[in-house]
Amino acid sequence: MELAGKTVLITGASSGIGAACARSFAAARCRMLLVARRRPRLEELAASLRQQRSADVAMAALDVRDRRAVEAWVGGLAEGWRAIDILVNNAGLSRGLEPLHEGDVTDWEEMIDTNLKGLLYVTRAVLPGMVARGAGHVINIGSLAGHETYRGGNVYCATKHAVAGLNRALAIDTLGTGVRVTSVDPGMVETEFSLVRFHGDAGRAAGVYAGLEPLSAEDVAEAVLFCATRPPHANVRELVLLPSAQAGSVHVHRETK
């Protein structure tokens, strides 16, 4: 399906998979709405897309955990930006890897508020317009952690299992409306994910990917673009993308020197 001229909203667009998706959709000549919490990074990304791709880009510093801010921002979009064709729900994070009885409740709340509630707030604000127009595509960035669990992944896995369930339920809710619903569920991707999980411990984060070649953010963005470009009668409901060295959450092959 031709994407040129389509309006794409990407959450968590300031880095990693979100930024890679922005570059991919800009290369496909889409109009970009980019939101994230870190304004300086958004401004840098928007400037590069305008310079390198002559892209039409609008951006906003937005925390998807703030329901009122999300509703106000979507409701206040300028006339030319209100018809959002593709929503990429990318904002998400993991905090900590402790067993549940040692977990930090603040970490739990941040994951639940971002990964699940933030996704719900943005989708609730954008979806009515898609349904009214009889066309649109919601692409949720899920995770292999939405299909499997692993030691210490308790609350993060719970949020991603919730996203997987929501994705399937939303596909039923929108059946017959012309709106497609997709979940792209990557395994190990080398972004800031592990650095955030371990609260800035770069050494521990680097160890996650030692001895293997993980996915890149661009690999995931390519999968997202593939889903978005299927013909209107076809929908990729779930796409699980893993590095070749990974067969599951705990089944990973690492090369040893």
Identify the residue ranges that each predicted region occupies.
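The beta1-alpha1 cofactor-binding region of Rossmann-like NAD(H)/NADP(H)-dependent oxidoreductases
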Residues: 39-40, 61-72, 105
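Residue(s) in the substrate-gating loop at a strand-loop-helix junction
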Residues: 143
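Substrate-binding pocket helix/loop in short-chain dehydrogenase/reductase
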Residues: 98-100, 107-112
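Conserved glycine-rich cofactor-binding loop
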Residues: 14-15
